[in-house]
Structure formats: C-alpha cells, structure tokens
C-alpha cells in the first residue's frame, strides 16, 4: 500500500517486551485510539473504508495501531511473546508512549475485546467503543479461540463458502502470518460479569444486526454500567464496509 493522504505512513513504538509495534495517525484534535480485529490491521479496519477520515474530519486525532502479529508490527512465532492480556498491555504502552491522558478508546471485534480488557485493567478514557463484540465473546473467549485455531491449523482444507474458509480468505487478503496468529490466540483472557459491572465509562456497543459471532451485543450493553447499543446493517464481516460504522462512532464521540 503506497503512502498517500489516505494511507499515512506507520510510526513505531516499543512494547514492554521490546517489540517494534506500528501505528498510524489521521487528523488533528482530540485523541482517539482505535484497535482493529483479528487477522486485520489498522489500515484495513479503519482507513480503507473511510471510517478514520469521517472521524478525523469531526476534529479527532485518530490513532490506529497494528496489533502484535499483524500488519507492520513485529510478528514473532515464539509463544513467550504472547502471554495473557498482552494486547491490552500493548495498548497501555501506546497510550504511555504518546503521553495520552484525556482521550477516547475503541476497537472492532478483537479490538473491542482489547479495549474492554484495558478498561478492566484501569484505563480511563472519556468514552469507549466496543464494536463487533457481544457478551459471550467477553465472558468466554474459548469458543472464538477454538474457531480461529481451526481456521489456522486447517489452511487449504476448509469447505468453500464456510465461515472458516471466509476467515482464511480474509487472512490471505491482509497478508497475515498464521504462525504468529496461533500463539496469539492463547493470550485471550475472559472477563467476569462482576468486572463488567464495575466499568462506568460510557461505552458505545456497535454491532451489525446480523452479527452474532461474539454473542449478543444487546446483552453486553446491559452488562455494562453505561452501555449504549447501536445496530447497523451487516454481519461480522460486512458491517465494517458500512459507512454507518464510522458515522456512528463519530456521533457517539461528539454527542453532548
């Protein structure tokens, strides 16, 4: 992908364990950290379909990391680089690196779960966005972990048109490294209902109407102290293509 006004070049910061992790920025104004989903990257999730531009145009500095194992970030194969909650720790390292104190935070799918884990661990953004995520995907990560392990260990064997086949096709589109993704799955951490109930950050729960990959978004909104549900068209893969995704995030962040 060539650098252009809509494809900003990556910057890099060091993780706590010394890896070089990439992030991109668009816009000026209030900082918003947006985290992408599994097999994706910051460009694909947030820039490619115009979401980052819509939000930046509303007066935000949109900061989009590539998770370890993804995009232009380091992608080690050694399982020791993927301890529990490492993605939340990386998010915290980025916030420290940029010196952010008053900011907003969100993500899609795995990025939404990572945002939630950061909240549990003490992050205090003004507002949070949990998109492409439901209650089951927060309480019990094992189901999705098992699905993606099946995808990664069966590459080239999945039935055409199946969910696993489509996930593999997406991985190939983004150039993901299966040998880095596999140990990353073991870093997923479950969150309890009690932990959810203690979160008082206003949170947008944003999900496609046909997306039940991670369980019920409505139940996730109910489980949070200040969860606000918004549904848009699409399923887990196609909701990202909808302009309503970026517009809904913008509207939530700019509301009084």
Kindly label every feature range from the protein language model.
Residues 53-57, 64-104:
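Active-site loop/oxyanion-hole signature of alpha/beta-hydrolase fold enzymes
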């Amino acid at each position: 992908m060539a650098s252009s006004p809509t494809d900003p070049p990556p910057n890099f910061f060091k993780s706590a364990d010394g890896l070089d992790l990439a992030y991109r920025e668009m816009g000026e104004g209030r900082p918003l950290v947006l985290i992408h989903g599994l097999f994706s990257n910051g460009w694909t999730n947030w820039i490619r379909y115009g979401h980052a531009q819509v939000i930046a145009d509303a007066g935000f500095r949109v900061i989009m990391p590539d998770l370890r194992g993804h995009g232009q970030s380091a992608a080690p194969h050694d399982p020791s680089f993927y301890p529990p909650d490492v993605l939340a720790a990386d998010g915290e390292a980025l916030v420290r690196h940029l010196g952010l104190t008053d900011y907003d935070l969100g993500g899609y799918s795995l990025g939404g779960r990572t945002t939630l884990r950061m909240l549990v661990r003490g992050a205090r953004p003004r507002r949070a966005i949990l998109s492409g995520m439901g209650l089951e995907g927060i309480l019990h990560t094992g189901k999705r972990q098992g699905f993606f392990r099946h995808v990664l260990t069966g590459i080239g064997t999945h039935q055409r048109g199946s969910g696993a086949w489509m996930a593999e096709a997406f991985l190939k589109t983004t150039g993901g490294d299966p040998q880095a993704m596999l140990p990353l799955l073991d870093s997923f951490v479950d969150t309890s209902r009690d932990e959810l109930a203690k979160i008082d950050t206003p949170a947008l729960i944003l999900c496609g109407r046909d997306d039940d990959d991670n369980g019920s978004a409505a139940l996730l909104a109910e489980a949070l102290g200040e969860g606000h549900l918004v549904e848009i068209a699409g399923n887990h893969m196609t909701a990202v293509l909808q302009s309503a995704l970026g517009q809904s995030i913008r509207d939530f962040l700019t509301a009084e």
